[in-house]
Amino acid sequence: MEDTQSVLQEYGLTAQFIEPVSPLVWKVYTDYGIFALKKLKEGRGKHFTDHMVAIEEKGFRSFVPVYRTNSGEFFSAGIQYGDIYYLMPWLQFDQEEERDQKHAYLFRETARLHERTAQELKVRRDEIERYYGQTKKKWEQDKIFYEQFVDRAEKEWYLSPFELQAITYFSETISAVNFALERLEDWYESAKEKDVSRVVMNHGSLSIHHFLYNDAGTGYFTNFERASVGPPQNDLLGFYTKMFRGFPKACPECVEWFYGYTKSFPLREAEVSLFLSYMAYPAAMYKVLNGYQTGKRQHEKEECTQLLKAYWQMKNIEPFVMKIHQIEQEKKFQAENESTS
């Protein structure tokens, strides 16, 4: 509490009441209104405010601003050494809307952010070939690793619960890797003929919990701490990877959100292929398998739970990427027919 009060003094504010919202966020009531005070997570850089200034200069203002201190700084140091805080207006995140409406709005605004910040970069063909070769080699080695794991396990007199589980998931995991490799090949064939690539300002932590609402129901991005310049599909990868974690779930509207985004900011053929490739690759499965194989062991029950969750994530992703691939193939086929007619 003392630390929070000292930080607020740098903004000329005195707290009447302070309500903890999370370990890093406080809702602060003052004579000048309600504010959100956030402590910067350890290890996070302060450069994200530069990104916020940059996107504002490009005409995008749908984000929660960070207030400057009385000395003109974006950040304030706390009493504890190394603690860094920043202050924002308080906005709600519990807007009463259906999930589909919330997400559709989020994806439209993400597309608008990407459209405002998009720029072309020159790319040499040897860079594309090197990236393709390195990624393909790694994923093919992962397939071999899993095959060898299964071969060794099947020779044992006794299979541990984890090994039995891993053998059960083997075929489906390899199929997912093969699909990812096929889409990587599609990306390479499309990208190698071009000498430009597109980058945008990615939010870096896309989530409905980082999309807040004012009293009029207008949405604003917050938490730009992981913002960075990169391919537009990076934000989508981060969002959907988190979305599909956990228990088995059906999400037909997830495809609709994707195409709501592309309606406002159309993705190029190479970008869609690379997005599908990385979405399909079962990274979580290999993370658990590698941990088991390299001796970074936990309790067998916990390892089995982690493997099951990774499997569920892979299976949740499967219908999503297959549906988008189907739609993209149909669009491509239709375009080819129209060009020859």
From Swiss-Prot:
Any one cellular-component term (Gene Ontology): endospore-forming forespore
Alphabetized InterPro entries for the sequence: CotS-like, Kinase-like_dom_sf, Spore_coat_YsxE
Gene3D superfamilies per UniProt: 3.90.1200.10, Phosphorylase Kinase, domain 1
PANTHER family membership: COTS-RELATED PROTEIN (PTHR39179:SF3), SPORE COAT PROTEIN I (PTHR39179)
Family annotation (NCBIfam families): spore_ysxE
Stated name of the protein: Uncharacterized protein YsxE
